[in-house]
């Protein structure tokens, strides 16, 4: 059976597929033969904002801001990292492999200058692109992000420190992730219950909204389309040094982090805000990890207003 990728002629660098929930889905061929899947929402001729999903996650998550992006004249694009959704796996990848993938993908789509927005596990990738592509990235947004390994461990309670150390060993974390994937496919309502169990009240209220639940499930289904290996590899990647200092980022950065975030404690956001030279941070009282679902209007407006 041929996949969408198999049908691409060798000379083709990008393919636009079927319209999807008021957006489009496509793939871009990279120099090494891999493909990056992506979704595009909003105004096709608008100001480009590149959205990096969380872990696990997929291009689908950008749908949360599709309507507002269209009204605001924003071209919202969401590439998927290797192994997620439509993107080809990249064994042994490093955090700093991503900016070059983004550069090639942006070239194929005719994007010269653009903003980046990383949410949760997408935050480190937004920082990496801001550091490595200062000639392409006009402004960066970082929401509810984790921090580099040393700062991450010091900010976590002891039990979570132990769990964070375990993700370095994919043979330990690997068996649990297929169970999460199966839960998403077969018992989605149960998955929402599991996700909500340890969340603060603000996050539980957000996750109780039917449209948010459906968006989460759609994103997870795409995240696990090829299995759980991409998530296991990414968790291990986050436990290693990033390969650059966030103190060397020269692009303007706007950061948001909920003070009540139990998944990635606010200490991580404070670390990034203190280290990044040109960073304006907002720490949100009573907000948890899912604040982006109610705060995306503020984020889009801030980044659009601040782009150079």
Name every feature range the model reports, one short phrase each:
Residues 43-46, 53-58, 120, 259:
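Active-site glycine-rich loops that stabilize anionic/oxyanionic intermediates
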Residues 55-67:
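The serine-hydrolase catalytic nucleophile loop
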Residues 113-155:
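Conserved hydrolase catalytic core segment
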Residues 160-244:
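Alpha/beta-hydrolase
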Residues 97-115:
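Conserved acidic catalytic loop of the alpha/beta-hydrolase fold
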């Amino acid at each position: 059976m041929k996949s969408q990728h198999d049908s691409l002629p060798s000379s083709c660098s990008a393919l636009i597929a079927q319209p999807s929930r008021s957006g489009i889905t496509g793939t871009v061929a990279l120099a090494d033969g891999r493909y990056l899947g992506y979704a595009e929402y909003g105004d096709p001729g608008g100001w480009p904002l590149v959205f990096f999903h969380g872990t696990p996650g997929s291009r689908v998550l950008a749908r949360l801001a599709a309507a507002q992006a269209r009204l605001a004249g924003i071209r919202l694009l969401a590439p998927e990292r290797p192994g997620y959704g439509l993107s080809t796996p990249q064994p042994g990848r490093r955090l700093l492999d991503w900016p070059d993938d983004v550069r090639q993908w942006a070239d194929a789509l005719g994007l010269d200058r653009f903003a980046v927005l990383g949410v949760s596990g997408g935050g480190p990738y937004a920082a990496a692109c801001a550091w490595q592509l200062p000639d392409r990235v006009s402004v960066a947004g970082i929401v509810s992000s984790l921090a580099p390994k040393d700062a991450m461990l010091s900010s976590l309670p002891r039990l979570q420190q132990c769990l964070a150390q375990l993700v370095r060993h994919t043979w330990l974390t690997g068996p649990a992730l297929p169970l999460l994937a199966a839960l998403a496919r077969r018992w989605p309502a149960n998955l929402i219950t599991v996700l909500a169990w340890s969340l603060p009240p603000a996050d539980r209220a957000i996750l109780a909204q039917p449209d948010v639940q459906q968006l989460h499930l759609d994103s997870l289904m795409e995240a696990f389309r090829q299995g759980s290996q991409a998530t296991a590899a990414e968790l291990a990647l986050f436990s290693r040094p990033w390969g650059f200092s966030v103190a060397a980022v020269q692009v303007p950065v706007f950061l948001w982090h909920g003070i009540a975030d139990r998944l990635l404690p606010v200490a991580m956001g404070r670390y990034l805000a203190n280290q990044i030279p040109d960073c304006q941070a907002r720490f949100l009282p009573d907000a948890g990890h899912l604040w982006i679902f109610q705060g995306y209007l503020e984020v889009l407006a801030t980044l659009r207003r601040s782009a150079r």
